[in-house]
């Protein structure tokens, strides 16, 4: 809202006054995107969102997908995204997205409509107890009472200011539960609320928030033992870092220190030439492990590593010092090995900890990795899940969103140094296989307006079945979007785990083969469809799909192939 456009004084009901106040204050605090699902109890919020000229509105018919779409938007833009839905189980459907947002520090703002208190727990339709429905996961939650003239308008504005200030300090989801009595829709005439709004004074004509909280960013202090630490044999591990600019500071620090860099897929450094690109697989090679174990200290930037082998190596080493640098105020220490936790951005840490002069590398890990890299290339020469993921790592252009289970692991293991994607995003907080299509769509829409940058989603068949109705979102994409679907007919990751195989236990209760293909799903939702039969076909189909529209590329492979290929590759590495 511009400074010249005064806040409206005429509204249908008090419900609409409060909804307009709430959304206007969110806008003044920087919110620009709102995700909405249809519903009657949420009509005041929906009408306020539709009337506001400053919001981008994103619609979906399924609240579970809606929450994940908002999650992707917030992850991609780095800005809070509001989500509006009606009462009842519609709210409960947001639980998975709220959990992921809390675990990864993503700023969602949940605006749930609710029945008034007198219609809760008395048999009224579509009414459940929504207060505290998300448990301890919101970083701020408030049950807004039914709108009334006895509660000042400044209460609504001040509540929003407090919530977003808390969210800025501790990134994660915020929940406002809005208890609206009927009427929910406008009558024949709007009412004049000038007297009620008058105490807001200049706010009505301003573009500034009511009472913004002034947050100060404490500088990252230089650690007193830094000079001693940088003289040791060190290792730098890069975990989840969402900002490529922050990630570059980590790579530059590793290079100047002469320390090896092991970069997770989520670090934005996976394709950097300074990264030991096949370190996960090389941890099966005794010579590589012995050389890496000479490291005395560990600096880790970002948490939630995909590689289990790397996590086990870190857990087993007798580190003289182990520091984790991550701005998220959470205990990111699953093995209780950390000895120092620094709450700051990687670039702030690097700026506060200068390296006096470049150090020569203390290790020969690149040399040790060469044989492993050759084994990887040989294993990826044919059409398979390994081959497709290895080739995708070389062809990728634009943004990349990677699903959980096998896709994340394969993309983290394979590939080569090169240009790589502009950004990599995952849902590795709760690491669920639900909502991945919707999250990727939201991530794709976070690209700067006017850009035609493509987004690629890689996921498995069970993940696709979990979120099949979110394919309806993809047809709305204004930019190229490619879905690469690895269809191995079930949960083949369980073939990598020690599940007993007798009495068909593995197949019947874990892998859950379904025998389904996705050609008709693509047709139903108006998507282009390709099913390559060779790596050359895949390269042709993928590069074409990057240019325009939305394309689903289904990779049909035998169910047991990926497990067999990885076991064979591991044996070859251990024997090399």
UniProtKB/Swiss-Prot annotation:
UniProt GO BP: menaquinone biosynthetic process
Protein name: 2-succinyl-5-enolpyruvyl-6-hydroxy-3-cyclohexene-1-carboxylate synthase
EC class of the enzyme, as a word: transferase
One Pfam family matching this protein: TPP_enzyme_C
Pathways per UniProt: Quinol/quinone metabolism; 1,4-dihydroxy-2-naphthoate biosynthesis; 1,4-dihydroxy-2-naphthoate from chorismate: step 2/7; Quinol/quinone metabolism; menaquinone biosynthesis
SUPFAM superfamilies, per database record: DHS-like NAD/FAD-binding domain (SSF52467), Thiamin diphosphate-binding fold (THDP-binding) (SSF52518)
Designated gene of the protein: menD
EC number: 2.2.1.9
InterPro entries tied to this protein: DHS-like_NAD/FAD-binding_dom, MenaQ_synth_MenD, MenD_middle, THDP-binding, Thiamin_PyroP_enz_TPP-bd_dom, TPP_enzyme_TPP-bd
Annotated family: Belongs to the TPP enzyme family. MenD subfamily.
Catalysed reactions, semicolon-separated: isochorismate + 2-oxoglutarate + H(+) = 5-enolpyruvoyl-6-hydroxy-2-succinyl-cyclohex-3-ene-1-carboxylate + CO2
Quaternary structure and interacting proteins, as annotated: Homodimer.
Function noted in UniProt: Catalyzes the thiamine diphosphate-dependent decarboxylation of 2-oxoglutarate and the subsequent addition of the resulting succinic semialdehyde-thiamine pyrophosphate anion to isochorismate to yield 2-succinyl-5-enolpyruvyl-6-hydroxy-3-cyclohexene-1-carboxylate (SEPHCHC).
Cofactor: Mg(2+); Mn(2+); thiamine diphosphate
One Gene Ontology molecular-function label: manganese ion binding
Lineage of the organism: Bacteria, Pseudomonadati, Pseudomonadota, Gammaproteobacteria, Aeromonadales
Database matches in CDD domains: TPP_PYR_MenD, TPP_SHCHC_synthase
Keyword field: Magnesium, Manganese, Menaquinone biosynthesis, Metal-binding, Thiamine pyrophosphate, Transferase
Cofactor binding mode and count: Binds 1 thiamine pyrophosphate per subunit.
């Amino acid at each position: 809202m511009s400074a010249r456009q005064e806040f409206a004084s005429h509204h249908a009901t008090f419900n609409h006054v409060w909804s307009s106040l709430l959304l206007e204050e969110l806008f003044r605090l920087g919110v620009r995107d709102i995700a909405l699902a249809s519903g009657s109890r949420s009509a005041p919020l929906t009408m306020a969102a539709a009337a506001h000229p400053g919001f981008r509105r994103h619609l979906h018919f399924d609240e579970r997908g809606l929450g994940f779409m908002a999650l992707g938007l917030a992850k991609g833009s780095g800005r809070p995204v509001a989500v509006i839905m009606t009462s009842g189980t519609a709210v409960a459907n947001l639980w998975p997205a709220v959990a992921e947002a809390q675990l990864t520090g993503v700023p969602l703002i949940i605006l749930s409509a609710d029945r008034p208190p007198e219609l809760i727990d008395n048999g009224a339709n579509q009414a459940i107890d929504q207060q505290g429905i998300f448990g301890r996961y919101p970083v701020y939650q408030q049950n807004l009472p039914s709108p009334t003239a006895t509660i000042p308008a400044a209460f609504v504005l001040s509540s929003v200011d407090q919530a977003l200030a808390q969210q800025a300090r501790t990134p994660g989801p915020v929940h406002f539960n809005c208890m609206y009595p009927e009427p929910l829709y406008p009558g024949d005439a709007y009412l004049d609320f000038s007297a009620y709004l008058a105490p807001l004074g200049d706010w009505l004509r301003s573009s500034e928030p009511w009472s913004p909280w002034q947050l100060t960013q404490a500088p990252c202090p230089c650690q007193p033992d830094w000079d001693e630490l940088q003289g040791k044999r060190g290792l730098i591990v890069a975990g989840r870092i969402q900002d490529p600019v922050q990630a570059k500071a980590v790579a530059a620090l590793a290079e100047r220190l002469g320390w090896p860099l092991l970069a997770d897929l989520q670090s934005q450094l996976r394709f950097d030439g300074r990264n030991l690109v096949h370190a996960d697989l090389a941890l099966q090679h005794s010579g590589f492990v012995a050389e890496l174990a000479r490291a005395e200290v560990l600096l880790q930037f970002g948490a939630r590593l995909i590689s289990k082998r790397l996590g086990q190596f870190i857990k087993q080493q007798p580190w003289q010092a182990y520091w984790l640098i991550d701005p998220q105020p959470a205990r990111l220490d699953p093995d209780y090995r950390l000895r120092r936790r620094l709450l700051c951005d990687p670039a702030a840490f690097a700026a506060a900890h200068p390296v006096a002069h470049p150090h020569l590398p203390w290790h020969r890990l690149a040399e040790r990795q060469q044989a492993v890299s050759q084994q990887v290339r040989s294993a990826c020469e044919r059409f398979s899940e390994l081959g497709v993921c290895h080739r995708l790592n070389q062809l990728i252009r634009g943004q990349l969103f990677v699903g959980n289970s096998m896709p994340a692991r394969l993309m983290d293991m394979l590939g080569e140094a090169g240009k790589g994607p502009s950004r990599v995003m995952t849902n590795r907080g709760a690491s669920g296989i639900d909502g991945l299509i919707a999250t990727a769509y939201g991530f794709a829409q976070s690209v700067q307006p006017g850009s035609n940058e493509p987004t690629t989603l890689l996921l498995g068949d069970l993940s696709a079945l979990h979120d099949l109705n979110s394919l309806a979102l993809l047809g709305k994409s204004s930019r190229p979007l490619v879905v690469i679907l690895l269809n191995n007919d079930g949960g083949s990751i369980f073939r990598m785990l020690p599940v007993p195989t007798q009495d068909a236990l593995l197949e019947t209760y874990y892998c859950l083969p379904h025998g389904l293909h996705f050609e008709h799903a693509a047709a139903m939702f108006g998507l282009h469809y390709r099913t390559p039969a060779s790596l050359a076909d895949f390269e042709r189909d993928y590069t074409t799909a990057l240019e325009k529209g939305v394309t689903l590329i289904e990779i049909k492979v035998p169910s047991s192939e990926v497990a067999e290929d990885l076991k064979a590759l591991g044996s070859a590495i251990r024997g090399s």
